């Protein structure tokens, strides 16, 4: 089984990234042929600083390695180092419906947030995302719940291409964790934890100092009740239960049972302690890895060569089926 997933190399990674995505990437190394991508081409669809982007690519690579990715057990590369991603994007636009792109929720949200230029890149973002996946004929794509719509589009595009030009692409399946797919902002549990949140108080950064992590968890917004149970009307407590359940590798019901009768203060203290302990080894390994930029570049370069070998073959078949270029 081949697994593919990508992550934006923007902003400092937070607990939601680690629990919702990166943890699954690490596990994926034991389940199949794992290919993981730093999607820097996606990052340039909104205003950004070029020098900062190059830095955050290395920051993100170091975080992924610190969290448990092993270049000997997976392919880790930078998207822009494999030009087949952009070529396949153009080819796939021939079988992508304009109306489908208009309906993408993330396009509506991101375009509404832009005060200046709304780039065509934001609109075509899902096609590039489809190309990312289909270039490797991935069987499975670990994604957050917010990416479900984009992956459904990728499936539609693959099926449409196959129907028109002959079987070419594997139609991928998504893998969304049952718990922890959406870690919410600690200060606004109606919103997903995000690197671009207006306030940093509700976002636990992977590299935050332990005392800051503890303060953020203990200051998490909760309701006026006292029961530690998962419930739609208790989003703050539900979020903390999910965080602790994922870290411990247990069902949320086990957390509810353990803290039955406990107060919110006691529960938050327990969550804070476990989050601090969970992040500590990642932060320590990151601090050892990040200064050696030559090593990080070498890992990404080696990964890009492996990725290119796969993607080049896939795109060559797609070109031939479409009648683009000389016949093979």
PLM regions: where:
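Short catalytic-loop micro-motif centered on adjacent basic/acidic residues
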Residues: 75-78, 142, 225
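A generic secondary-structure signal for well-formed alpha-helical elements
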Residues: 61, 68, 96-99, 138, ...
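Short, histidine-centered active-site or binding-site loop motifs used for metal coordination
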Residues: 7-9, 40-42, 138-140, 197, ...
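N-terminal Rossmann-like or analogous alpha/beta NTP/dinucleotide-binding catalytic cores
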Residues: 2-131, 274, 287
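Internal, conserved structured core segments that host functional sites
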Residues: 109-161, 165, 185
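Short helix-capping/linker segments at secondary-structure and domain boundaries
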Residues: 98-102, 135-142, 245-255, 283
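Conserved nucleotide- and phosphate/pyrophosphate-binding catalytic cores
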Residues: 15-17, 149, 155-328
């Amino acid at each position: 089984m081949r697994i593919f997933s990508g992550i934006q190399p923007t902003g400092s990674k937070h607990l939601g990234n680690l629990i919702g995505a990166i943890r699954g990437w690490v596990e994926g190394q034991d389940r199949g042929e794992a290919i993981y991508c730093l999607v820097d081409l996606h990052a340039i669809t909104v205003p950004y600083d070029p020098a900062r982007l190059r830095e955050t690519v290395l920051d993100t690579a170091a975080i992924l390695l610190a969290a448990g990715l092993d270049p000997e057990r997976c392919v880790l590369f930078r998207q822009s180092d494999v030009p087949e991603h952009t070529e396949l994007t153009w080819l796939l636009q021939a079988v992508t419906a304009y109306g489908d792109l208009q309906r993408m929720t993330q396009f509506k949200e991101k375009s509404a947030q832009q005060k200046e230029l709304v780039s065509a890149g934001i609109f075509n973002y899902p096609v590039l995302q489809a190309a990312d996946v289909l270039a490797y004929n991935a069987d499975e794509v670990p994604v957050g719940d917010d990416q479900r719509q984009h992956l459904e589009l990728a499936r539609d595009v693959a099926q449409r291409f196959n129907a028109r030009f002959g079987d070419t692409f594997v139609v991928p399946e998504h893998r969304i964790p049952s718990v922890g797919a959406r870690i919410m902002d600690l200060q606004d549990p109606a919103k997903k934890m995000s690197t671009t949140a207006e306030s940093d108080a509700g976002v636990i950064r992977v590299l935050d100092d332990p005392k800051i992590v503890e303060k953020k968890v203990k200051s998490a917004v909760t309701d006026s009740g006292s029961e530690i149970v998962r419930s739609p009307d208790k989003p703050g407590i539900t979020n903390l239960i999910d965080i602790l359940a994922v870290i411990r590798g247990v069902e949320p019901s086990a957390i509810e049972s353990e803290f039955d009768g406990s107060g919110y203060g006691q529960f938050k203290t327990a969550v804070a302690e476990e989050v601090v302990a969970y992040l500590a080894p990642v932060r320590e390994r990151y601090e050892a890895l990040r200064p050696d930029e030559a090593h990080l570049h070498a890992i990404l370069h080696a990964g890009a060569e492996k990725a290119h070998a796969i993607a080049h073959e896939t795109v060559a078949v797609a070109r031939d089926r479409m009648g683009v270029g000389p016949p093979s």
